[in-house]
Every structure is written in structure tokens, then in C-alpha cells.
């Protein structure tokens, strides 16, 4: 399985920010403490499933995992819409087909960019481009396709999970929407030195299409 640990993600973020901070110090002689705005992008698709205690249920399954062929084929036929293997809903349905124990405990399902944004702001949101790699988007409403959401929920209703699909997916935002601000915890996560101040506005987390 292609994966990255939460430790890898955290340390990668910190290394990236430390590089930016050092660059500012070298060029301008100033310690970076504030930014006008910020945003995050990451590899689209994949599968990061969390329980109600915000614990990761299974290792992060990245878009590179081609292990969802059965789910992708069935969903593509059911929804009359091409669902590639890398899409989050394909990973979710494959886990259901395999009767993976963790599925019943899912409280939140997101992507890498969505996870980073959530940890830094507390907001469970995605930009519409990134969200389109989780589940089909209705171009009129700029939100998840409600007809397809219902079709999926009907497909799995006999499983009697304690969740509905839309309730575990991130809220969809478009460019310019308020997506939260950097929290105190997020600032410390990004810059363990404590120099970075909270309160910086963030744009919706996006992917290839954002």
C-alpha cells in the first residue's frame, strides 16, 4: 500500500515552513511571524478515514493505490459516471465490499489537503476542485451531486452503518469562500518554535483542479 504516516505529514509540513522561514530571514533579516493569507494543496483523491475521536482508522491510502477496481467498476455503472480507482468514494466502497471492520466507525473522510487544513484550522472543508476527486460534483450547485449521494446511500443501506455519505465528507467551498483561520494549535504545529502567530486566514484547500 502506498502510504504516508501522520508523522511524515507533520514533519513534511514543518520542514517546508522552516525552509520558507529561513529564506525570509536570509533575504530580509526578519523573523516570520505573520502572513496575509495562506493555503494548502496536496495529492488529490485517496482515503483518510477518522473516527469520532479524530483517530486515523487505517493508514492513509494515497491515490497511487490501484486496489479499488471492483468498487470503481460497480460505482461507475451504478452512477452512470466514471469513478476512477483513485477517487475517495472508490476507496470507501472497496473497504465496504471487503467488509473492513473500520468502516462502521467512520466519522470523517478527507484527502491529504483536507487533513492538513483541518489540523491547522479545525475546519472540515475542501475546495470544489479537490472535492471533485472525492465524489462527483453538481456543476450547478457547486456541491456534491445529491442524486448520486442518495444512490450511494441506498446501495449500502443494508449495512446499517451509523453514517450517511454526505455527513462524513468535507463541506465544499469555492474560491473566495472563508475557509477558516490558523488556530493556536495549528500555528504551533506548523512552526514549533512559536514565532508564527495564529489568526491568518486560509483559502479552501485545493488539488489539481483548484
What residue spans do the PLM features occupy?
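N-terminal glycine/serine-rich phosphate-binding loop of ATP-dependent small-molecule kinases
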Residues: 1-57, 73, 105, 166-167, ...
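Phosphate-binding/catalytic loop of phosphoryl-transfer enzymes
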Residues: 43, 52, 56-57, 83-130, ...
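Glycine-rich phosphate-binding loop plus the immediately following alpha-helix
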Residues: 64-100, 115, 135-151, 157
Amino acid at each position: 500500500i502506498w502510504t504516508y504516516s501522520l508523522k511524515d505529514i507533520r514533519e513534511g509540513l514543518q520542514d517546508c515552513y522552516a525552509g520558507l522561514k529561513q529564506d525570509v530571514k536570509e533575504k530580509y533579516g526578519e523573523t516570520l511571524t505573520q502572513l496575509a493569507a495562506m493555503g494548502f494543496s496536496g495529492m488529490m483523491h485517496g482515503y483518510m478515514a477518522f473516527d469520532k475521536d479524530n483517530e486515523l482508522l487505517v493508514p492513509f491510502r494515497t491515490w497511487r493505490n490501484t486496489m479499488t477496481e471492483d468498487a470503481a467498476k460497480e460505482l461507475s455503472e451504478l452512477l452512470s459516471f466514471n469513478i476512477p480507482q483513485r477517487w475517495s468514494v472508490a476507496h470507501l466502497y472497496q473497504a465496504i465490499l471487503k467488509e473492513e471492520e473500520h468502516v462502521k466507525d467512520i466519522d470523517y473522510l478527507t484527502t491529504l489537503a483536507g487533513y492538513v487544513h483541518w489540523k491547522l484550522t479545525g475546519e472540515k472543508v475542501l475546495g470544489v476542485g479537490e472535492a471533485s476527486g472525492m465524489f462527483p460534483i453538481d456543476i450547478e450547485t457547486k456541491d456534491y451531486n445529491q442524486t448520486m449521494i442518495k444512490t450511494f446511500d441506498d446501495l449500502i443501506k443494508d449495512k446499517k452503518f451509523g453514517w450517511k455519505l454526505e455527513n462524513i465528507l468535507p463541506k465544499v467551498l469555492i474560491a473566495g469562500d472563508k475557509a477558516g483561520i490558523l488556530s493556536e494549535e495549528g500555528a504551533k504545529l506548523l512552526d514549533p518554535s512559536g514565532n508564527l502567530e495564529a489568526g491568518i486566514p486560509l483559502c479552501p484547500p485545493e488539488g489539481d483542479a483548484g
